[in-house]
Amino acid sequence: MTIQISLTQFLTFKAFVSTNAKYNYILKQKNNDGYHPSHDYWKNFREAIHRLPYNNGDLTVLYDAVDMVKPEKKANYTKSVNNFINFVSDNDVTFFEVGKAKWNFENELVINASPDIGMIIDGKKYFVKVFPNVQQKKSRLDSKSVKSILTLLQETNANFNTSSGTFAVLRVNSPRFFKAEAIKERDSKLLKIDAANFVNCWEAV
């Protein structure tokens, strides 16, 4: 049976250094009953971003997301919302709808990797994956991890015309906008090695 996971799950697995940590993470995922909204910290933030192409880019929906979350989340949500809005304002961004995309590794592993939103910046179209996470040392979204993400995004099977724009990653905290470049053979091979490692660990647990 093909393993189906989210991009976040794959990145979390990759971030663990020790085999023991990877084992425990896979065990937790296999024992999990599946997705539940209460376990999705950034659900309200992402849903607000998804609405932007349909409300003429009205950013007030992001403040609505802050109002909806529990008190213990408000500080992180407020920081991410303010950083996202500052990025949009500084770059005169307009939004458009994007479709779905998945990355398939030898029909053994499928990773859901749909862009969160389409952005037009300086007349250029970008299919953007947004990472609002408050950065911690053990899971920091650095240039190395972003390169792997962008390689995966470019190799996805998408239901929209990917040749009309460029894949990109927006790191919301410690803000930075990463644009995809031509895929390097080495990066593609490293990605497949990580995927094979995930499959092997999954099957061994």
Pin down the residues of each PLM region.
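A structured, charge-rich N-terminal accessory region that forms the first stable segment of a protein
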Residues: M1-P71
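Alpha-helix boundary/N-cap detector
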Residues: H36, D40, E72-A75, K144, ...
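Flexible, glycine/threonine-enriched loop-and-boundary segments that flank and lead into catalytic domains
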Residues: A101-E106
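Active-site beta-strand-loop-beta-strand hairpin of nuclease catalytic cores
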Residues: E108-N112, D116-V128
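Nucleic-acid nuclease catalytic cores
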Residues: I121-A182
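Domain-level recognition of nuclease-like catalytic cores that cleave nucleotide substrates
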Residues: T166-V205
